[in-house]
Amino acid sequence: MKPPSVSVVVPLFNEEENVAILQQEIREALAGLDHELILVDDASTDATASRVVRGAGVRLLRFSENAGQSAALLAGMRAATAPRIALLDGDLQNDPRDLRLLIKAIDDGADLACGYRAQRKDNALKRLTSRIANYVRSRFVGDGIRDTGCALKVMRRECVQAIVPFKGFHRFIPALVKSAGFRIVELPVNHRPRQFGKSKYGLRNRALKATTDMLGVRWLQARRIRADIVSEQQPTSLSD
């Protein structure tokens, strides 16, 4: 069976009011493009799973207990069958209409296309702290990305092998992929205000975890094995 052209991975946690709307938006945005939608329910405590609209190309993965956004993304990426994998949040703040822009960047030669929120629809404090965090992170890990907090990304399937699975890796996908030698581009995308539900992240839990993770990523970058095979020689037989 021929795989789809793109796998769209969406982590979900308590998004009962958003998931059906998001599914419809993704269907409309990717109309005419063969795709699969992988929804990963991170043990939601509301009716998220029952609100998923079942149908062809829709896959629902469910965790038995809450494992976090990184775990949900990893499960979705590993389950993906397409050569291109798209990531976006389930809270409707990412605009699925931007997916084709990032997919085109992959078709044009990039290995990972990252969106950055050109006009963020968050409060002033969140924008300021995010700007500071992005600056510090970019300088420290050297990924050159202005907005790693933007979940909207499309990558070649091969990039998944560069991702070291640890809690919080989703904040450092560009750094991990770039350090493995893949080509990254960043493009402006739309950002929408949250309509339903509440943000799962606060300033405190993001700052402390991100700082610890940043040190770990820097260590991984320094310790990454870099060895390219340039030739292969057949052993000489004893009879020669």
What are these model-predicted stretches?
Residues 1-124, 158, 182-186, 227-240:
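Structured catalytic core of nucleotide-sugar glycosyltransferases
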Residues 1-3, 142, 166-240:
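Hydrophobic helical membrane-anchoring modules
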Residues 9, 40, 74-77, 103, ...:
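Conserved protein kinase catalytic domain
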Residues 39, 93, 150, 164-165, ...:
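Residue-level marker of alpha-helix boundaries and capping positions
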Residues 44, 54, 65, 121, ...:
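Residue-level signature of the cytosolic catalytic core of signaling kinases
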Residues 70-73, 99, 129-133, 160, ...:
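A general structural signal for well-ordered alpha-helical segments in protein cores
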Residues 73, 126-127, 157, 196-202:
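Short secondary-structure transition/capping segments
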Residues 107-161, 178, 212-215:
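Short, flexible, basic/aromatic active-site loop/helix in glycosyltransferases
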